[in-house]
């Protein structure tokens, strides 16, 4: 994992977070990333920032600076947690990674998630994809329709994407 990816994970991951500290939401990370780009600060630079640096260099409020430093405090435990995930075949991909889907960045721009967790064949992240969502309660006919539709989608060389919530799509 690159230092830029470590920084994004440190500020945006929900792993190893204290109950009284929230990781940055995608919109918050996007706003911070825009500030950093404007003044030439790379995400990895944040790993050595103090609360005062967040205030003076990035113009953060004292409350926000405290939140950022609290998120930084978990970097060691987060590194162990990420290593555990990696050992189980679960990977974290951040906006800073080459593996991050270009289509996602192009379509969503600043709204794209700063990171996501994935497992399996990462090459599908760069294929055309169709997303499916559906109700939890479906009739047998609806379930068959979903299976047939997904089979045709896969047969046409599209990846199938699901949000993972319980429903006909999972």
Q: Predicted segments — roles?
A:
Residues 102, 147-158, 167-170:
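Acidic/glycine-enriched connector segments
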């Amino acid at each position: 994992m690159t230092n830029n990816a470590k920084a994004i994970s440190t500020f945006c991951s929900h792993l190893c977070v204290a109950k009284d500290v929230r990781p940055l939401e995608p919109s918050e990370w996007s706003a911070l990333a825009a500030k950093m780009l404007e003044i030439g600060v790379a995400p990895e630079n944040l790993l050595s920032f103090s609360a005062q640096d967040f205030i003076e260099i990035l113009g953060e409020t004292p409350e926000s600076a405290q939140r950022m430093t609290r998120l930084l405090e978990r970097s060691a435990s987060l590194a162990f947690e990420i290593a555990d995930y990696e050992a189980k075949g679960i990977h974290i991909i951040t906006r800073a990674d080459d593996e991050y889907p270009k289509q996602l960045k192009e379509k969503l721009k600043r709204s794209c998630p700063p990171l996501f967790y994935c497992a399996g064949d990462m090459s599908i992240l760069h294929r055309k994809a169709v997303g499916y969502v559906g109700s939890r309660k479906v009739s047998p006919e609806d379930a068959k329709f979903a299976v047939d539709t997904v089979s045709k989608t896969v047969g046409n060389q599209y990846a199938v994407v699901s949000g993972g919530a319980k429903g006909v799509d999972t």
